[in-house]
Amino acid sequence: MYKVDISPAANSVLEEYSFRCAKDNGTACALRLLDAFDDKVSYLENTPLIGCARLKYIPSKYRVITFWPHLWLVFQVKEEDNRVKIEYIIDDRQNYGSFLR
């Protein structure tokens, strides 16, 4: 089993989207968003190599997996430490170039 760490940047994006979801669509929607995130974290604990490893604009050291419509977890697998590091959450409708720098 792998340990999943969540970066402050990813946590901040998750918090922002959950607040926005609650404001626009209600608390139940925000809770479903957080549940979807937790489900993917559970998958990563058990099967860390899931997700896509080759996207055109994402550096090859990262893998990505979708967890909510338009929201992707960007993560690295550190097999030597049995650890997964969720680095960022991107919205595929927006320019995520700041993550690539």
Residue locations for each model-derived region?
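Enriched for short, Lys/Arg-rich terminal
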Residues: 71-101
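Extended aliphatic helical segments
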Residues: 4, 13, 41, 64, ...
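Basic, Lys/Arg-enriched alpha-helical interface segments
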Residues: 1-58
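Basic/aromatic recognition patch in beta-strand/loop cores that engages polyanionic ligands
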Residues: 47-80
